[in-house]
Amino acid sequence: MARANEIKRGMVVNYNDKLLLVKDIDVQSPSARGASTLYKMRFSDVRTGLKVEERFKGDDILDTITLTRRTVTFSYIDGDEYVFMDDEDYTPYLFKKDQIEEELLFIPEGGMPGIQVLSWDGQIIALELPQTVDLEIVDTAPGIKGASASARNKPATMSTGLTIPVPEYLSAGEKIRIHIPERRYMGRAD
């Protein structure tokens, strides 16, 4: 059991007899005094895959489910299924493309370290990515010299198809670090 203000992205809650995976949380603080903060949560139903949206007050109690986490590595694509191998015992985990469509935007061609498979009671629930990823810019407007002083951004498409705003001074071919939960540019990759 946890209060709504303690729920984080990637957790699973049991709500209305449904297992719901938390995909996103928006915090809304009302301007009136004494009013409680609202948490608008977007879920994915674990059993059906449907998207669910609910609102909670900060002190509402939710039933959280403890998940098993296994570190995996992207292995190969088999038709419309993506296969990830367990790093310890080499167990294959299969995901359909539509199950992990969002996550695929952040996984580069050679894979990335830190990917975890979330399971509960032997059932595979989701794929969890690390907080950051380094991706290469493949398409953007040409870089402008001396634009580092301005805070203006331009859209850039990464090697995986993801499009995010980046500073004007960056150009195609550069590797950048992206904060996955917020889909934002953090800096140049090392």
From Swiss-Prot:
UniProt-recorded Gene Ontology molecular function terms: translation elongation factor activity
A Pfam family recorded for this sequence: Elong-fact-P_C
Record GO biological process: peptide biosynthetic process
SUPFAM superfamilies assigned: Nucleic acid-binding proteins, Translation proteins SH3-like domain
Gene Ontology CC terms: cytoplasm
Family: Belongs to the elongation factor P family.
HAMAP family found in the cross-reference section: EFP
NCBIfam families: PRK00529.1, PRK04542.1, yeiP
Protein name: Elongation factor P-like protein
Protein's organism: Pectobacterium carotovorum subsp. carotovorum (strain PC1)
